Amino acid sequence: MKRIVADFETRSPVDIKICGAYKYAEHPDTDVTMLAILDVDNPTDIRMWIGPNFRHLHPTEVTDKELADIVDNCDEFIAHNAPFERAIWKYIMCERYGFTDIPIHKVVDTAVMCSMVGLPRNLEKASEFLNASGYVKDMEGSKVMKRFIAPKLPVAAKRKQLNPKNPDLVKSMYERAMGILKIGGVPDFEYHQYLDWYEDKKDFCRMVEY
């Protein structure tokens, strides 16, 4: 039996805690930064698929064809809180990047398995409870990862560059856009110019290690 464990990292201007996994995944500005794939039979070999829009920051270790072969031929697709992975796979990997959908009977959710036996659903807490050997929370890596997941307010110099006469307008338009985007909507104005994404090659490589 071929079993793989999958873990997505994504970025989006919408807040998943407010709009939920499916509206988050459906939003046109949500994108996959990377996907970690692990073969259960070879747990020390974690391979990274880097999203097409982020390969200028780090080369992908798994090609699109290799990833398609791995997922299409697996018997179990394992993820913690699998509805998120399923939503990202369906709305981004399939509809945007051309991968094949994963049959529901192949999906295994380890968070559900934790609930079934009375363990915490939170991955870190469940690992602590089980005294999982080798599991150590990488706090620095987690901090770096959080820099990439959402846009930040443009710095004053960039706000002035976007609108030399009224840089405060850029700030107010950014805040207006973020207010709408966070609930999964799309503003009725061209908001992309007001979003400032964090893209640092060194930190992205650190996130891959995380």
Predicted features and spans:
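Short beta-strand scaffold segments in enzyme catalytic cores
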Residues: 33-38
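Active-site-proximal helix-loop-helix substrate-binding element of RNase H-like nuclease domains
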Residues: 41-64, 70, 75-210
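Entry/capping segment at the start of metal-dependent catalytic domains
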Residues: 1-31
